[in-house]
């Protein structure tokens, strides 16, 4: 049967519209604390600099992969890390080693400025290609220049960095795992225009800004 030009145009519109609408998506991350409090963080993506990593993050978010993942690493006013599916259980033995079952090609282009969101990975000795873990990610509460050129930065926190700083300051065990179970309740991908007001990224390098550095490079 011969399809009319109008039908073809309609089909093209149906299949291409979602892709066009997703060009400037953001992630709304709901974080649940032990006392039941829920706070929200908004992340923008670096689509051009890390397209593969961004696409993977969106895919996992839309599948509900991140729901229930705990923050399993927190360094005060420096970095917080989450995204390990093994952290959904209370057994902490293997937490930090999990993922979706695959790794991602490195897209190392951006710097670790304040608010940077980056993909975690295992160390260079066993991972000289610097491939990223498929789901674990961390957020820089303050600039971490010693990590530049080593990890894929794929986004930036534009709202709620204070929430993550609060997470980083919680009491933790000797492995930097917060004693309190702080969970990703939900990660949603939405068009930026649906945000209630314009969101702007925090200004890195403010004169009064404290810049604590990590005590060590972790074998992610």
Language-model segments: which ranges?
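Cyclophilin-like peptidyl-prolyl cis-trans isomerases
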Residues: 8, 18-220
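N-terminal secretory signal peptides that target proteins for export/translocation
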Residues: 1-2
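Sec-dependent N-terminal signal peptides
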Residues: 5-14
């Amino acid at each position: 049967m011969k399809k009319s030009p109008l039908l073809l145009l309609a089909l093209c519109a149906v299949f291409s519209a979602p892709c066009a609408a997703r060009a400037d998506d953001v992630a709304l991350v709901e974080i649940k604390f032990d006392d039941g409090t829920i706070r929200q963080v908004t992340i923008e993506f670096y689509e051009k600099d890390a397209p593969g990593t961004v696409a993977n993050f969106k895919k996992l978010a839309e599948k509900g992969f991140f729901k229930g993942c705990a923050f399993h690493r927190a360094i005060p006013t420096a970095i917080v890390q989450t995204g390990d599916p093994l952290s959904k259980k209370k057994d902490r033995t293997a937490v930090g080693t999990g993922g979706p079952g695959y790794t991602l090609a490195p897209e190392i282009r951006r710097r670790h400025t304040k608010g940077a969101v980056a993909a975690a990975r295992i160390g260079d000795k066993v991972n000289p290609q610097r491939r990223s873990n498929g789901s674990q990610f961390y957020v820089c509460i303050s600039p971490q220049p010693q990590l530049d050129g080593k990890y894929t930065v794929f986004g930036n926190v534009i709202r709620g960095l204070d929430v993550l700083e609060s997470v980083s300051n919680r009491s933790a065990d000797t492995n930097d795992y917060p004693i309190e179970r702080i969970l990703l309740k939900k990660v949603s991908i939405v068009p930026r225009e649906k945000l209630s007001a314009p969101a702007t990224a925090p200004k890195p390098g403010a004169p009064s800004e404290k810049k604590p550095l990590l005590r060590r490079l972790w074998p992610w």
